[in-house]
Amino acid sequence: YKRQHQGIYDVSMLSSIPGISIYSPDSFAELRESLDEAVSLDALTAVRYPRGGEPEYDRSVYHPICGDAAVAADYGVAPCLTVITYGRITAEASHAAEALSARGTAVRIIRLKKIYPVDAQALLPELRGEALYLLEEGIESGGVGEKLAAALLTALSVRGGRVPRTVVHAVHDRFVPHGDVPVSYTHLRAHETRSN
C-alpha cells in the first residue's frame, strides 16, 4: 500500500458528479462559512481544505465579487492580466502579483471561494487586461482551470467580446509521489523542467 492522494485529483473527479457544489476556502473563517453553507444546502456539497493550515498573505486588499462566490484584488493600476485561482496557491499568486506590480506590471487576482460550478457570465466583467491565467494545484484534465477557461472563452466568443490570451497552469496528467507540500512542489518543478 502506497499513499498517493495529494488533493490534486479530487476536483476533477468530484466536478463530474451532476449537481455538486465544491468550495475551496483558504482561511479558517472561510472554512466555517463554507461548512455552514454546505449544511444549509439541500444538495451534494464538497468542502476542500488544504493540509498545512492557513496560507499567509494580505487578504485585506481583496473585495467580494460575483455575490460572495469570489474575491478580487488589483495589484497596481489598470491591470494588464487577470489570474484566476483558488485555495492555498492564492498566497503564491498574491506574492507574485506584488512583485510584478513593484516592477510596473499591474495584475488582477481573482480567488474563487466556490470553485464549482462557477458562473462564467458573472466573471466576464471582472476580467482585466489582455491575458488570462488560470492557476491551480489540481490536475489539469477536468480541473477548474480547464473547465472555467472553456466556459469563459465560449461566453466571450458568443458575446463577441475580446478573447484574451489564455493559459491554464495546473498539474499535467501524472502521479505525484506522496510527501509533504514542499517535497511535492519540488517534484513537480523538477518534472516540469524536464518536460520543457
Map each language-model feature to its residues:
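Conserved small/polar residues in nucleotide/adenosyl-binding loops
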Residues: 1-4, 186-193
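Conserved thiamine diphosphate
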Residues: 2-82, 91
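Short, solvent-exposed amphipathic alpha-helical segments in soluble enzyme
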Residues: 5-9, 36-41, 61-66, 95-102, ...
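Short helix-loop-beta junction
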Residues: 13-16, 92-109
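Short beta-strand segments
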Residues: 48-50, 85, 135-136, 170
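Structural motif
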Residues: 81-82, 131-133
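Generic long, charged, amphipathic alpha-helical segments
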Residues: 107-126
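Glycine-rich, acidic loop regions that bind phosphate or pyrophosphate groups
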Residues: 147-176, 180-181
